[in-house]
UniProtKB/Swiss-Prot annotation:
Name recorded for this polypeptide: tRNA-specific 2-thiouridylase MnmA
Organism encoding this protein: Christiangramia forsetii (strain DSM 17595 / CGMCC 1.15422 / KT0803)
Signal peptide start and end residues: none
Cell compartment(s), UniProt: Cytoplasm
Primary localization class, coarse: cytoplasm
NCBIfam families: PRK00143.1, trmU
Amino acid sequence: MKKVVVGLSGGVDSSVSAYLLKEQGYEVIGLFMKNWHDDSVTISDECPWLDDSNDAMMVADKLGIPFQTVDLSEQYKERIVDYMFNEYEKGRTPNPDVLCNREIKFDVFMKIALSLGADYVATGHYCRKAEFEKDGEPIYQLLSGEDNNKDQSYFLCQLTQEQLSKTLFPIGELQKSEVRKIAAEQNLVTAEKKDSQGLCFIGKVRLPDFLQQKLKSKEGVIVEVPAGNDSYLEEDINFKSKIDQLQHLSKKFNYQLTDGKVVGKHQGAHYFTKGQRKGLAVGGTPEPLFVIDTDVIENVIYTGQGKDHPGIYRQGLFIAQDEVHWVRRDLAIDSDEELRIKARIRYRQPLQDATLHQTENGMYVIFDQPQASITEGQFVAWYQNGELLGSGVIS
C-alpha cells in the first residue's frame, strides 16, 4: 500500500483530497504546516493558523487518519518573508504563493514527508498531472485544473520534474462545487469554510503594515503623467537587429519628475505596485489614478488617469537567463529559437497569445496584444494545449 502525506491546510480542498486518497486505497497521513508566528500585522483578531490547525485536526479525526503539525516558520521567514522584503525594497513585487510552493510545500515540506516514508505528497491544488515515456524516461506534465475558474497551475509554475514525480493532485479533475458537495456528504467541518485569502499561510495581512516592520516609511511625491506624454508616441524605428526590436518591445518607460505634475504625497514608493489604484489618496481627477511606475531610488510614484492610460501597457517582457525555468526541460528552446505559446502574467488572467524568443542573456516574451501592468518580480507562465511548460521572473 502506497503512503501519501497530505498537506492539510484546514481548508475544504485539502480535506477532500485526503478523503479521496483514502477512498482510493492509499495509506494517508495528514500534516499541517505552521508557517507564521507574528500576529502583530494580521487584520482583526484572527489567528488564522490556530483555527486552521484545529480544522485540519478535526478533518483527520473524522477520516481516521494520523495527524501531525510541523513548524516551518523559521524556513518560511528565511525563504519567503525575507525574500519579500528584499524584493519590495528593490521596487519589485514578489509573488509569495508561487515562492511558497517552490520553497516550502514542494521542498522543505516534501522532504519531511519523504523522510516519514511517504511515496507521494498530495495537495488540494486545482491542477492535474499526467505522465508518459520519452526515450525510456518518464516525463511528468503539469496540466490546468478542470475547473477553469479555479485553475491553480500558475502557482505551481516553478515545480521541477523531480517534485512532480512525487506529487498527487486529487481534486484536479473536479469543479469547486463538486468538492464542496463531497465535503458536505462526508460531514467534514470544512465543507462551508470560505476560501483563504491573502498571503500564502499568513492569513489576512495589511501589506503596508507587514512591510513597515522592515521597510521604513519615507515621504515622497505622486506624479501624474498625462496620456499625451511624448514618450508614448509611436516612432518608426529601423531596428539594426532582432535583439534591438525585442528590447524595444519589452523596455519600460523611464519617467522623470518633469514628465508630469505633482498631485500628492505618499509614505514610501516600495509600498506600491504597478496597476494599483487603492491607497493613493488623491481625489479630484475625472478618472481614477493608477500606478504606472514606482521609482524606489528617488522615492517617486508615477500615475496615469484611467485604466486605458498608455503608461499601463507594454507588449513584451524579459526574463534573465538564471530566472528562466522549464517544467518540461525536454521542450526548452535554444538561443535564437522561438516558440508560440499562451502565457499569463498573473493568477487567473485569461491565457494570452505570445511568442518566446530565447537569446544568450535570457528570454523575451512578446505578446500579440499589449498587456496591462507587467510587473517586475512577478512570474510569467507559459502553456501549450493546457499544459504549463515553464515560467520565469519578470525583470
